[in-house]
Amino acid sequence: MKALLILVLITLVTCNAMIDKLVSNSKYSSKKSTLKIIGNLLFDHGYEASWVAGVLANIFHEGTIGKFESSAYISHPEKEPQYLKYMDQLYGYRTKYSNKIITDVSIHELDSLLVKLKAANWKKGKFGLGCVQWTGGRTYNLFQKYKSECGGRDKITLDEATAAEGKMVIGEFTSGYKYIYDEWKKNNPNKNAPGAAYNAGHIICMKYEVPADTANKAKKRGQTAQEMFSVMTK
């Protein structure tokens, strides 16, 4: 038992050191806090470094804890997605939520908005939120975790939002999206190979994040995952 405990402690120290290496790299400094929190959480739940790199690569390209999707396509307004135009026009999204952090908005008002969008089955209005930029029903599920963490208050703290998003990521990868991890694990027997990190970043983009221009972004995120893995393990 004592030997097992020592092994667990050594593993945790090693994993924490990997994340510290990653976030100390200036290339990833813009998402330092988010990458550190989610990365350590994934390691705490036993995920391999190459898989962690794949998740973090997608988060690096996708979002920040508690942050709303921006609808401010100032230079190229023609590129603004239709669902964000709808949100801007009907709900004043650009002013109330666009590019803001969840700690700065009213939880009660956001609750009311999400109930309306859910009732319409997300057919016209939705928005990305959080480190994964969850949309539609997944935004609603995340919001329920926000509400649970803040205990009914109208404002949520960053620590509470972080806890909620951590539970969301782990919850998805251990339930409805577990098949993605299982598929990756089956097809990548050598988890310590850089290629395993690339494949993690790629499949997570293709089947978990699914952004616009998915195929091209999956290649980029696979490359980022491989680079992150190299930084973490050197």
Segments predicted by a language model, with ranges:
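Hydrophobic, Leu/Ile/Phe/Ala-enriched alpha-helical segments that form helix-helix packing faces
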Residues: 42, 172-173, 229-232
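Active-site or metal-binding loop neighborhoods of secreted/extracellular toxin and effector enzymes
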Residues: 184-234
